[in-house]
Amino acid sequence: MQHLSEIVEEARKKGKKRLAVAYGQDAHTLAAVYAAYKEGLVEPILFGDPKIIEQVCKEENIDCNIFKIIPESNDVKCVNLAVNAVVTGEADVLMKGLVSTDKYMRGILNKDAGLFPPKGTLSHVAVVEMPNYPKLLVISDVAVIPQPDFKQKTILIGYLTRIANLIGIKTPKIACIAPSEQLLPSVLSSTEAALLAKMGDRGQLGNIVIDGPLSLDVALYKEAAEIKKVKGSSVAGDADCLLFPNIESGNVFFKASTHMGGGEIAAMVMGTKVPCVLTSRGDSSLTKLYSIALACLAAK
């Protein structure tokens, strides 16, 4: 796939999913959910204040009647109710509305709720469409794990692979990002990238092609790989997925590619029993729509 709009098309083929939206009462969220409904992706269930929802719908020219509204004015209670809906099978996909990410994640991680498996690994995966890259790019982790350890990185590779498979990439090329494409023994991200690449060579990480360490420019641009004389890499200049060494590098790339590079994104939480949409409260309606589509595509 080259465009996020293709994810919408693929998700539509799976039929409508029931979408539980926690504190879904802001204009961007309601516009995205309404668009997803019109695209044939979801049957929306909103947890929030009916009066506010109706007022925002009126201001945004949205047909409020298409929403099933569960009245609740408290944002934390909205999260808990929405989480319970997906856990009990009343909904298929969870989505964050106007509530803060911290409160949303606490609801997901609540052991009593049953959405997050014991000893599981929660992560964030995004699909990025950039004007200057010829295909969609799957990236992780940019929002959840501050400093993934080696074992967590192997799990993140599994998440990247799953999303890549969903968007039509049978054998994804995964780049383990580090400061340099040269192996630097004193830099942990560099040595771990090399170890992951060796595991991949031996088939320990599934049906993927993986290489590292690779600097960002070498991973994405063949010209950079040629100039730096990186030889023998099937990933350099043609990566499908980027595994970042920490949240700082991933988050900076994520925001720079969208806010400065003109990119669009779809994002979701991985590691839960059902797909969970996680976008920023300031993200556009289009970003939220694409994220809904990605989660619907991942839903059973």
Positions of the model-derived regions?
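Anion-binding alpha/beta catalytic cores of soluble intermediary-metabolism enzymes, centered on
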Residues: 1-235, 240-300
